[in-house]
Amino acid sequence: MSKETFQRNKPHINIGTIGHVDHGKTTLTAAITRALSGDGLASFRDYSSIDNTPEEKARGITINASHVEYETPNRHYAHVDCPGHADYVKNMITGAAQMDGAILVVSATDGAMPQTKEHILLARQVGVPYIVVFLNKVDMISQEDAELIDLVEMELSELLEEKGYKGCPIIRGSALKALEGDANYIEKVRELMQAVDDNIPTPEREIDKPFLMPIEDVFSISGRGTVVTGRIERGIVKVSDKVQLVGLGETKETIVTGVEMFRKELPEGRAGENVGLLLRGIGKNDVERGMVVCQPNSVKPHTKFKSAVYVLQKEEGGRHKPFFSGYRPQFFFRTTDVTGVVTLPEGTEMVMPGDNVELDVELIGTVALEEGMRFAIREGGRTIGAGTISKINA
């Protein structure tokens, strides 16, 4: 049986749920599919089918970003249910780097929690341009405590504005009640999706640039070969195009023999779309997450660069102490993280939390790098800085 062909008749948007652990991100994702399935715009996905990798089930906590698709009357959405647990912020970075906007889920009973703040900060660092807030679990607050919800809203608006997200719409509701079929709360989820439609603009995709896709995952399909998945950052890829695999080792050439999106075949993949590419003659061990697949010779692997970096303050979740030349944190680019050695500018003895500084970095492995590219710097499970590559040295 041949696969269905993907229909491209609406603008395609990538969004995701972010926020503190147990505030209801995955429940909301399921509730959105439930609310839209009533209009024939989504297939209902229950909580357990979204929260679906083995290590997640055991802890009841989402680890890998899970992709769900649905439509509103105006758009087609690919929705990433992003990790909420502190150990897995790494995946949040790679999941968030692909969002055109995010739904920040906050429990009305708790208000903003440490991870709420970290996720807003990370969203800003990795370039998520717009946020819509879903204030969840309002059904658990009694009438006499209703003004608490107003306080939580005010606090959230201030927090978002501080990080550069001004005037974010806030929708109140209960994901669980919507999931259980309560008509009033299903209406709230529709209201949320209307706010997403209205407040997260369709981005201009970089269709005309040379094709590039950071690889998120690699699968082996028996009898067909190796599939790499990810979100196309720019350009167009067609079946039978020659491409290169760049980064984390020697550059390899291959040919694209298939393009798929949500298990449907496509003649081509375009900038902004999450796709799987079937590659000819590439074994599962020849390719890994963190490489990019791109138009031949459009990007080169590098290890050394100059960068403009902002080092987070202690209050923003950053380091408490300065660092010196020879510091070795992890650098996160697109879907990869690599240890790098930092050299401070001449005459600078140390870098304090809160500083803006120019750093020379040498990575211990090659990565497909370009000038102007953004990255996060992490150490011991927390983000300590964010930067942009100003010049490639080698």
Curated annotation (Swiss-Prot):
Family matches, as InterPro entries: EF-Tu_GTP-bd, EF-Tu_GTPase, EFTu-like_2, EFTU_2, G_TR_CS, P-loop_NTPase, Small_GTP-bd, T_Tr_GTP-bd_dom
Top-level taxonomic group: Bacteria
The gene coding this protein: tuf
Reaction(s) catalysed (UniProt annotation): GTP + H2O = GDP + phosphate + H(+)
Subunit structure: Monomer.
Family that this chain belongs to: Belongs to the TRAFAC class translation factor GTPase superfamily. Classic translation factor GTPase family. EF-Tu/EF-1A subfamily.
Region (G1): 19-26
Enzyme Commission code: 3.6.5.3
UniProt-recorded name of the protein: Elongation factor Tu
Binding positions (GTP): 19-26, 81-85, 136-139
Domain tr-type G, residue spans: 10-204
Listed PROSITE patterns: G_TR_1, G_TR_2
Annotated localization: Cytoplasm
Region (G5): 174-176
Region G3: start-end pairs: 81-84
Segments for region (G2): 60-64
UniProt keyword annotation of rRNA-binding present: no
Residues given in the record as Mg(2+) binding sites: T26
NCBIfam families in alphabetical order: EF-Tu, PRK00049.1, PRK12735.1, PRK12736.1, small_GTP
